[in-house]
Amino acid sequence: ADFDGDGRTEVAFVETPHIGGSLRLYEFRDRKLREDYAVRGFSNHAIGSREQSQAAVHDWTGDGVPDIAVPDARRSAIRFVTFADGKFREFDGVAHNQKIVTALRPAMLDGSGTVYAVYGLADGTIVAVRPNPGR
């Protein structure tokens, strides 16, 4: 996806999610894969867990550039981030007393067209968050 709005496709991933993970964006430029951004403090799965889908992509800010929802390094908060206009910005987040343990998915739940980030916590709670892009 074009995560920064520059017209080029980037690949987003969390490197070393178990030890102070970094959210990184790379793009193919000048016939090489080049790092565009690296921001520490993220995770997308727990050691030993088979769940490998703890991140979601959707344009929550409505600016035409995909945003990313991903847990913090401890997996006890969800962070909503954007790289629009070439700048990293965290525009919302929700902290929890339990770890995030399920996949994280964008979902329309009520027919209004609003897209929520949906995921589950270690105590069995299902969470649906509608991020506030203006925060």
Placement of each model-derived feature along the sequence:
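Beta-propeller-forming repeat regions
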Residues: 1-135
